[in-house]
Structure formats: structure tokens, C-alpha cells
């Protein structure tokens, strides 16, 4: 079966595993998914990510992060730019998520980055998702 939006599938898998407090999940790997997972790790939303080689495209194993009382670190994930409706932001229009409490993931010509990084580099791009 052909998947029309693999990034939305990855975000949905993370959201679902987070809701039932799973420790880890696996998603089919791709370059952009790997970059998104590394960004989520760097920003402290997930504990770890590892790439597992297989004879197809590879697998990303994502380890979710929870607080001291087992509260969720990720409270929300939302896909913004979709295959049917792409959303782009210029350098001076990069969105803020919850007044800086969350992050916006942008796909730019310089790679996938957060809204904060895009503002520092004065670059715009496709608004992939919001995470808070």
C-alpha cells in the first residue's frame, strides 16, 4: 500500500504511543523523518532515536520521554503542511508555537530546523509541524 503522507504517519505513531505511554516505537525510516526525530531529541521532546538497518529502507526506533510522575513531555503534535496544501513561511513570517513554549519544524534549503534556528539564520521554508 502506498502511503501518501509518511511524515503525518510518523507524527501520528508518536502521538498514539505517547497517549498510551509506550516506552518506544518504530517507524519506517527516511532522511527527513530521521532529521525530524533528531530535532525532537535535541529539543528534549524524546529521549533517544536510533537507526536500524534492514534490507529495505531502514527503521527508526524512537524512545519516548516522560516526566517524574509519568506525565507526558509531548502534549501535542500537529501536521501543518500537507501534500494537498503546502504551507510556506518567509523568513520574517516564521510562526511561534504557544508564544515560544512549543516548536515549529521547518524544512528549509539548509535542512530541517526549528523556528528559533530559522529566525537566527533569517531563512524561511515549509512549515512541517508544530510540537508542544
Curated annotation (Swiss-Prot):
Gene3D superfamilies in the cross-refs: 3.30.1370.30, 3.30.1490.10
GO cellular component: ribonucleoprotein complex; ribosome
GO molecular function ontology, one term from the record: rRNA binding
Domain of life: Bacteria
Alphabetized UniProt keyword annotations: Ribonucleoprotein, Ribosomal protein, RNA-binding, rRNA-binding
PROSITE patterns the record matches: RIBOSOMAL_S8 (PS00053)
Gene Ontology terms: biological process: translation
Subunit structure: Part of the 30S ribosomal subunit. Contacts proteins S5 and S12.
Reported function: One of the primary rRNA binding proteins, it binds directly to 16S rRNA central domain where it helps coordinate assembly of the platform of the 30S subunit.
Family listed: Belongs to the universal ribosomal protein uS8 family.
Name of this chain's protein: Small ribosomal subunit protein uS8
Amino acid at each position: 500500500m502506498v502511503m501518501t503522507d509518511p511524515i503525518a504517519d510518523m507524527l501520528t505513531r508518536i502521538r498514539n504511543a505517547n497517549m498510551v505511554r509506550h516506552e518506544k516505537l518504530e517507524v519506517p525510516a527516511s532522511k527527513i523523518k530521521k532529521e525530524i526525530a533528531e530535532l525532537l531529541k535535541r529539543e528534549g521532546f524524546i529521549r533517544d532515536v536510533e537507526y536500524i538497518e534492514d534490507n529495505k529502507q531502514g527503521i527508526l526506533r524512537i524512545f519516548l520521554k516522560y516526566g517524574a510522575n509519568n506525565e507526558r513531555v509531548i502534549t501535542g503534535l500537529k501536521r501543518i503542511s500537507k501534500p494537498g496544501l503546502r504551507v510556506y513561511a518567509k523568513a520574517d513570517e516564521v510562526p511561534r508555537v504557544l508564544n515560544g513554549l512549543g516548536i515549529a519544524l521547518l524544512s528549509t534549503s539548509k535542512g530541517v530546523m526549528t523556528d528559533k534556528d530559522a529566525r537566527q539564520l533569517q531563512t524561511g521554508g515549509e512549515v512541517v509541524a508544530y510540537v508542544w
